[in-house]
Each structure stands twice: as C-alpha cells, then as structure tokens.
C-alpha cells in the first residue's frame, strides 16, 4: 500500500473524526497524545496524518500535500477549491443561521447590514432570496455586532445555540445544515485510487452501520 496522507482540522471536528478512523482499523494513538506535534504516522498502516487549521485543509488537499482531507462543509462552501468532495461523514453537524437581537425584523424592506465570518456564503444566500444586503466581514466573535449596532444581524454557525443565548440573540432563519466532509486530491484519486477508495468504502460502511 502506498502511503496516504490525511489532513485533519484541529479542534472540534478532530474529536468527532478520530473515532471514525479508529473504527475502520487505523491506529490514531499518536493523534490522541499529540502534544504540540502536527504530523503523525499511524502505527499499523501506511497512513499519516497532518493537523492544520480548518480553513487550510482544503488548500493542502488541493495542492497535493495531503491525499485526503476532512473538513467542515462550511469551509468548502466559503472557499471554492479544486478537489473532490467524496463523503458526508455525518459528524460535526451544525447549522448556518441568521441571528440577531429580539427586535430585529427580518421582513423589513430596509437594506440590512449583516456581520459574518462567511461573506461568500452570506452573499449567495441573500442573493438567492432576492435581498440586497451590506455584508461586514468579522474575524472574531460576531455575536457582539448587532448588540453594539454594527450590524442588523449576523450569519454564523450554530451548534447548540448556547453562545447566542448567552449574548441575548435568537435565531431568525436556519439557512443550511452542514457537517464534516471527506475530500480528495484529484491527482491522488488516479494514482492512489485503490488505497483511497479502500478508506472511503470502509468509512462509508462504518457510517451506515452506525445509523
């Protein structure tokens, strides 16, 4: 088997995804005891892992540094990359939502100002609804934008809604459901087809058996 390099996101998705790889027989003990390391070799297979920021996973896969990647659908929607999206892993499920303070009126005809970390997704969503909005990109916590009057509402990923609730915001619209996706480098799918499809097929069977 030729070596397969897999890019994973650090943080929340990492905790959901590692058990899936273990369930298909890939040793992830180094990943679970990683310290500050970012590159790991599975002990019982020709598979290695790299841990990078979520926004960089698709870039590493697109450029062939990683053969396979696992990343949230939000990253793929916001950043168009020349990769294959192969499998919905069904973990890390969240929703894109429009949220604001209780006095926000989503039906107002006044041009709205929306704060978000996801300007591309937000622009497409409101364009499809036929609404002209001003979009302000925020890198940090967007929840504060409507509270301080920077924006009328926000577009953000909501998992439990606890952060919104703690800041006095409520969800006005649920836009899209998102989850972790397995992506593949286009060239690698040709040169390492058997190895990659072996992983994908085992993962798919594991997901189906768990439903």
Curated annotation (Swiss-Prot):
Its main location: cytoplasm. One of its GO terms (cellular component) is cytoplasm. It catalyses: 1-(5-phospho-beta-D-ribosyl)-ATP + diphosphate = 5-phospho-alpha-D-ribose 1-diphosphate + ATP. Gene3D superfamilies: Periplasmic binding protein-like II. The keyword Nucleotide-binding applies. Keywords: Amino-acid biosynthesis, ATP-binding, Cytoplasm, Glycosyltransferase, Histidine biosynthesis, Nucleotide-binding, Transferase. The keyword Cell cycle does not apply. Heteromultimer composed of HisG and HisZ subunits. Catalyzes the condensation of ATP and 5-phosphoribose 1-diphosphate to form N'-(5'-phosphoribosyl)-ATP (PR-ATP). Has a crucial role in the pathway because the rate of histidine biosynthesis seems to be controlled primarily by regulation of HisG enzymatic activity. Belongs to the ATP phosphoribosyltransferase family. Short subfamily. This is ATP phosphoribosyltransferase. The lineage of its organism: Bacteria, Bacillati, Bacillota, Bacilli, Bacillales.
